[in-house]
Amino acid sequence: MSRLAAPILLLLATMACATASARTTPTSEPTASPAHEDVEFHSLGITLSGTIFVPAKTVAAVVLVDGAGKTLRKTGLARVLANQGIASLTYDKRGVGKSGGVYAGPEVHTNNVTPENLQLLSADATAAVDVLSNRFAGHHVPIGLIGFSQGGWIAPLVATRSPRVKFMVFWSGPVVTTYEAVRFEFFTDHKAEFWDHHTEAEVREHLRSNPHQYPFIDTDPVESLQKLSLPGLWLFGGRDVSVPTGLSIERLRALAASGKPFEYELYPEADHQLVEDTAIPAIVGWIYKTVGARGELADLGRRPQ
């Protein structure tokens, strides 16, 4: 059982009870569609297009930092979070959908994890943090990040850039170098049955014994994480074939042992995508705990859709 099991069980128990304090805790009950507003903002000479989802009462607000691939804004997840009192800004990645600029591909491996591209994407996410922070200016709403997969390298860069970021959440975010992650992906070949035939020891040996042959400079997220003191939560799947979970947890434990306020949740049977019905309550509960959401939530009103 992972270290957040007790808080999550408490959260689920709270969600099941319809009490007078329900308005200050996450709820799984269906609610009206949250208000949302489309926005455009600028980053390094291009225009990005996104949507801000605004709950009637807001506990916190997050920028959703997407993973690799030609990803569009995550409106479905944004609605779920808004119904739990968490506002969000989600946007089309540069060069995708309605956003300008050039998408750096391919879908996996090589040049989408170059330091140049990661810095570019972190600049975009930093601009999104500024937009979201300005939207809630004067309301004392904590701003955070939720990074997905590749976002595990991007979000720490954003947090070192912007003092407005107060917490971080990582959905299958690597705490390993880009070289290690690419070597791991080639080793697993993204096959779901990989862990039926290989062990953690074999993975470690493969990562140690196979020198890199990649035409880009390595990026180590630990270098950024060592500079940060804000709270962080990482969610991992034990059967992930895109991110080496065991090594990521080892690095994360070392950071926590040095005094960093970092936590993790491990789902042994989950893959890289995790399970939304489990992961989302864990994220919401942790954010509530981290921002000290007690008493009345911030009543920010609604903007026209």
Predicted regions and their residues:
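Hydrolase active-site cap/lid region
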Residues: 161-205
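Short beta-strand/loop motif that positions the catalytic acidic residue
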Residues: 228, 234-236
